[in-house]
Amino acid sequence: MGANSSTIKELSENEYLKKLSGMDSISENEPFWNQLLSFTLSTPTNSADSKLLEEGTLSICKSLIENNPRTGNLGALIRVFLSRTKELKISAECQNQLFIWQAHNALFIICCLIKVFTSQVSEEELLLHFTYRATDPGNYEADTEDLFEELLFCLIQLIVEIPLLDLTYSILLEAVTALIVLLSYQLFHKDILHESPIHKHLMNGRCLPYTSRLVKTLLYNFIRQEKSPPPGSHIFPQQQDGGGLLYGLASGVASGIWTVLTLGGVGSKPTPQQEQSSPLANQSLLLLLVLSNLTDSPDCPNPFRQSVTFFKNTQDSSVSPTPNPHSFQINFNSLYTSLCEQQKSDQATLLLYTLLHQNSNVRTYVLARSDMENLVLPILEILYHVEERNSHHVYMALIILLILTEDDGFNRSIHEVILKNITWYTERVLTEISLGSLLILVVIRTIQFNMTRTRDKYLHTNCLAALANMSAQFRSLHQYAAQRIISLFSLLSKKHNKVLEQATQSLRGSLGSDESPLPDYAQDLNVIEEVIRMMLEIINSCLTNSLHHNPNMVYALLYKRELFEQFRSHPSFQDIMQNIDMVISFFSLRLEQAGADLSVERVLEVIKQGAVALPKDRLRKFPELKFKYVEEEQPEEFFIPYVWSLVYHSGVGLYWNPQDVQLFTMDSG
C-alpha cells in the first residue's frame, strides 16, 4: 500500500490511496486491490498512533467523499472485502495466512475511511455512499443489494464464527472496532439518538437472529482476556530457505508506512498496563456496552439489552415459561472470575452493575457465591481511592454495593468473612477485620470525603442507604468500624450546629434589610437534618436488632454519649432518640455500679453482661430499614454519554477529534 512511503506525512501522496479516492472507477477484479491490500501492519493500539494515521489520510478520505458518488470505489472496496471473507473460516482452519491477511487489511482501510466519513457526513449520506456504483454521476442502484446491511451482517458473522487464534486475532479486533466506528455517530450529537438508520439495521433484518451469538461472543472475549499476539509472531514468519512467496510479497510491496506507524515508535509509548492488557477483550466489552445501551421503543425493544437481561448459566436447566428469543447460556463461574479480576476499569464495573441490575440470573448466582470477598474487595478499593477515580466509576461501585445490600443473606455473610492485612487500607493497620466491618469503614470514608469535597447529595443518599440496609444485620463490628460510625455522627452534629448558627445570624442580619437574598441556610439545615436522622436510624436499627452482637458499638456510643444530648428534645429526632437514650442510660448505670477506673476489657465485659439483661420490650419498634436501588427515569441520558466517554478514552487505537465530540464535555466523568 505504500512501497515508497517513509513518513506519515507522505500518506496523502500514496499512489494507491490516491487512486482509490480519485476520479477513476476501479473494477472489483483489477490487480490494483491485491497491490492495495498487500501491506504489513499491527493495528494501532493507542490514540496517538490513530491520530497520526487519521491526520495523514484526511485529505484522501475527503477526496473519496467527493468522488465516490461518481466512482463507487467505496462500494467496490467493500465488495472486495466481502469476497475475501467468504472463505475466512476455512482459511483460519487451514492456517491460510494470505486470505486472512488481505481480508484484515481491507477491513482496516474500510474502518479508517468510514471513521472519517462519520465525522464529515450524516448517517443518511453515509448509507447513500454505500449505494453508489460506477455509473453516471450521482446514480445509484438501491434495489440490487443493501451493501451496508451486507457489511454489518458480515462483521457480525465474522465475530461470532471465526475462531480466536493468533492468526485471526487482528481481524477479529478490527471487526469489533468497525462496529464501534459505525455506531459512533452518537458522539457527534448532543442529544441521545432515538432514530438511527444504523441502529435499525442492527436491530432488525438479517442481523437480528445473530443477536444472542454476538452478545455471547463479546462476553466470552471479555472472559478470556486473550493477550494480543507478539507483533510479527503470527504474520508471515520467514522460512528457513529465505522466505516463501508470502513473506517476499509482504516485505516487497509494503515497506514503509505501517512500519513507521508501528515499529518506528510513532506516538506515545504504551504503559506496562496497556501492554499487558487484552485489546480484544477491552474492545469487545466496549461494544457490548454500546449495543446494550442503544435506545429502544415499545414497538422495537433493544434485542441486545434483552440478551444481556435474560442469559443464563450453562448449568441452569430450568425452562422459562416465556423464553426470550435472544437468551443464551454461558459459564457463570468464568464470568464471575473475570468480573472479580477486572474491576480496576470503569467498563468492567459498568458491566457488573448492568448484570446485577438487569439480569436476575446473574444476581442470584453472585449472591449465592461463598467467595463474595473476591468481588466486594475490588469494589471497596475503588471507593477507597475515591480521590483518584472519576465520579461515574465511584457511583457505579456504590450502586453495586447498594444492590448487594438489598439481600439479607449478603448482609449476614459479609460479617462471617474474616480478612487479614488489607494492604490498600492505609488509615490504620487492620491485621484482622470482617468484610462487613471493612465495608462500613470504606462507605463512611466515602461519605466524609463527599462532605468535605464534592457535597453530592446523591452520593450521600446511596452510601447511607447501603449502611441502612446492613444495619439490622451488623455482627461483631470491629472497634474501629464502631468508632467511625459515631465519629461520622459527631462530624454531622458539628456541621448541624455550624449551619444553625449561620442561619440564625443570617436571620438577624436580614431583618430590615432589602439587599440581595442571602444563602438558603434553611435548606442546608433541612438537608443536614435528613442525614442526621438517617444516621440515628442506622444506629437505632443496630441497637434494636443486634445489640448483643455488637459490644464495640455500645462502647463507642457510651464513650461519646454527650453528642446525643442536643438531639434528645429536637422535634425531628425525639422519637428515634428514645431507644438510643434508653440504651445509653441503661448501660451508663451498669458501668457506675461496676465502679470507677474500669479498663477497656472490664467495660466490654459489663456491656456484654448488660446486653443479656436489657429488657428488649422497652425498645420501641420501628419499621425495618430497607432501601432498593431504582434507576431514574430516562437512564439513557446518563448511561449513553458515560459509555461513549469510556469508548473515547479507553478504546484501543481509536481517536476522535475532541472538537467534534458533542455528547459529553471532555472533563465529564
Curated annotation (Swiss-Prot):
Keywords: Cytoplasm, Golgi apparatus, Lipoprotein, Myristate. It is found in: Cytoplasm; Golgi apparatus. Myristoylated in vitro; myristoylation is not essential for protein targeting to Golgi compartment. A lipid is attached at residue 2 (N-myristoyl glycine). Necessary for correct organization of Golgi apparatus. GO terms for biological process: Golgi organization. This is Dymeclin. InterPro entries: Dymeclin. The lineage of its organism: Eukaryota, Metazoa, Chordata, Craniata, Vertebrata. Belongs to the dymeclin family. Pfam families: Dymeclin. GO terms for cellular component: Golgi apparatus. Its main location: cytoplasm.
